[in-house]
Amino acid sequence: MNLYLLLGALAIFSLVYDKKENSIFLYLLILFLVFIIVSPAIISKNTESTVEDIPSHKAKSVRKKLEIEQALDAILNKNTSSID
């Protein structure tokens, strides 16, 4: 959120600052520089993912089977405890 606020503020600043001249060039230059400066921080933040953050099709099916087994075990344990 702060990144978008910063980019918006810089865009408005660049348009106001260079209003008399060709402001599009300065606007694009500032946005490009901010993107180059901020992109390594965004990329390094996203590299700390684990296997659970990126589930594959196989991992999803295994997790679903495990949840079903746990639910069935809970039902069976409830039924056997009431018989005893």
Curated annotation (Swiss-Prot):
It is found in: Host cytoplasm; Host nucleus. Keywords: Host cytoplasm, Host nucleus. It holds the Pfam family Ac76. GO terms for cellular component: host cell cytoplasm; host cell nuclear membrane. Its main location: host cell. InterPro entries: Ac76_baculovir (IPR008561). Plays an essential role in budded virion (BV) and occluded derived virion (ODV) development. Participates in intranuclear microvesicle formation, ODV envelopment, and subsequent embedding of virions into occlusion bodies. Interacts with protein Ac75. This is Protein Ac76.
